[in-house]
């Protein structure tokens, strides 16, 4: 028996091209004091299992990390947090509270929306700036975002549970 895992479209997810302009950068740069810094990207739905709050906490407690890079969290699309279901509402509310507690204004970007068609561009934008993709999920059955990020030229960081173990081992572009 052969296991064929899900893949990713390499025509859509590919490394950045030199001197390419990324329109999504405008949505990110408005949050940041120093948008030239590399980005640490987390891209997931706002779900407690995705462990985004622990990422913000770790970033908030590391002055060295804050000096080296900005944090970009792409966590779904919203108009008003109060209109979301309880789970996503709690995650996003706490995310904003953590940004306040650690005084991360100017260092963390949390755009309100993105289109599915912009995801590949977001990965390439981060890769072009020397950034990294992080999947802080407590457990990840597969981890399609890791494949997409790797195909887009990003090094990846993930927890040592589930699919990321095999993906990072095969892609040889990250750490657990």
Question: Could you describe each region identified by the protein language model?
Answer:
Residues 155-158, 175:
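Short hydrophobic beta-strand element within catalytic cores of glycosyltransferases
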Residues 143-146, 164:
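Short glycine/serine-rich donor-binding loops of glycosyltransferases
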Residues 75-127, 131-132:
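Nucleotide-activated donor-binding/catalytic signature segment of Leloir-type glycosyltransferases, i.e.
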Residues 149:
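Donor-sugar nucleotide-binding helix/loop cap in glycosyltransferases
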Residues 170-171, 175-176:
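Conserved acidic donor-binding segment of nucleotide-sugar-dependent glycosyltransferases
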Residues 138:
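Aromatic "clamp/platform" in nucleotide-sugar-dependent glycosyltransferases that forms part
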Residues 7:
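Carbohydrate-associated surface elements
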Residues 28-50, 56, 71-74:
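Conserved donor-binding/catalytic core segment of Leloir-type glycosyltransferases
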């Amino acid at each position: 028996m052969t296991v064929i895992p899900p893949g990713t479209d390499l025509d859509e997810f590919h490394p950045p091209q030199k001197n390419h302009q990324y329109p999504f950068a405008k949505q990110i740069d408005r949050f940041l004091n120093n948008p030239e810094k590399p980005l640490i990207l987390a891209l997931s739905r706002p779900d407690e299992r995705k462990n985004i709050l622990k990422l913000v906490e770790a970033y908030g407690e590391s002055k060295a990390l804050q000096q080296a890079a900005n944090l970009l969290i792409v966590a779904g699309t919203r108009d008003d947090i109060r209109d979301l279901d309880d789970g996503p509402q709690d995650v996003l509310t706490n995310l904003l509270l953590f940004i306040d507690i650690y005084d991360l204004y100017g260092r963390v970007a949390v755009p309100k929306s993105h289109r599915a068609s912009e995801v590949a561009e977001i990965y390439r934008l981060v890769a072009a700036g020397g950034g990294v993709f992080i999947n802080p999920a407590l457990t990840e059955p597969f981890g399609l975002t890791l494949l997409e990020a790797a195909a887009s030229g990003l090094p990846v960081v993930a927890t040592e549970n589930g699919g990321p173990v095999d993906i990072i081992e095969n892609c040889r572009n990250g750490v657990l």
